[in-house]
Amino acid sequence: MALRRKISTYWADPPGKGYAEVWIDFKEELGYIEYYDDNEKKFFTEDFPNKSIRYVEDAAENWALGIKKLENI
């Protein structure tokens, strides 16, 4: 069994701003988001301890829609 699995991908709107992948780490029991630019280069990972996968997916969708801003990037 894999220790992590990708749950979903959210593409930024407007296009050209990259995408976010929602992952779950079964060993750590942790949901997280990996953020990528349009060149498929990962530029940030955000952990969500003690949050549901639905919460993590909502955060990724909010980023893709421009509602959620990443701090310290």
Set out the residue ranges of the language-model regions.
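Short N-terminal "domain-start" leader segments
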Residues: 1-31
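Mixed-charge, Lys/Arg-enriched low-complexity segments
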Residues: 2, 38-73
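Short, flexible coil/linker segments at or flanking structured domains
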Residues: 10-12, 21, 36, 44, ...
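Short aromatic-glycine-(Arg/Gly/Cys) micro-motifs in beta-strand/loop hairpins
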Residues: 24-44
